[in-house]
Swiss-Prot record:
Protein name: Small ribosomal subunit protein bS6
CDD domains from the UniProt entry: bS6
Family: Belongs to the bacterial ribosomal protein bS6 family.
InterPro entries, A to Z: Ribosomal_bS6 (IPR000529), Ribosomal_bS6_sf (IPR035980), Ribosomal_S6_plastid/chlpt (IPR020814), Transl_elong_EF1B/ribsomal_bS6 (IPR014717)
Task performed by this protein: Binds together with bS18 to 16S ribosomal RNA.
GO cellular component, one term: ribosome
Length: 100
């Protein structure tokens, strides 16, 4: 969606716990295809390995990464597609910041 306004989003990404050492670089690589569309990563925070409340895709824990970014709606759709295609990603949650 070219021309749609940039909005701020917060994305929680859970990766397999075996990816803890390279979690930041793996998550950053997911944004490479959409950077030309104006997506800007404002902040990326690796929270470390966390236990899940229930089993997800046969796993009980994973590395949690929180990403704050600016993007338009079309870019967010592409980011979601990239996340679904990446086997390392266990679960994602996307929130629009500042929305009531």
């Amino acid at each position: 969606m070219l021309g749609s306004p940039l909005r701020e989003y917060e994305l929680l990404v859970s990766l397999g716990s075996e990816f803890e050492p390279e979690a930041e670089s793996r998550v950053r690589s997911l944004f490479t295809p959409v950077e030309p569309e104006g997506v800007t990563v404002k902040h990326l925070d690796v929270l470390g390995v966390r236990k899940f409340a229930y089993e997800i895709k046969g796993r009980n824990d994973g590395v949690c990464v929180v990403v704050r970014l600016l993007a338009n709606a079309g870019s967010i759709a592409e980011i979601g597609r990239q996340m679904r295609l990446t086997e390392d990603v266990i679960r994602t949650k996307l929130l629009r910041v500042g929305r009531k």
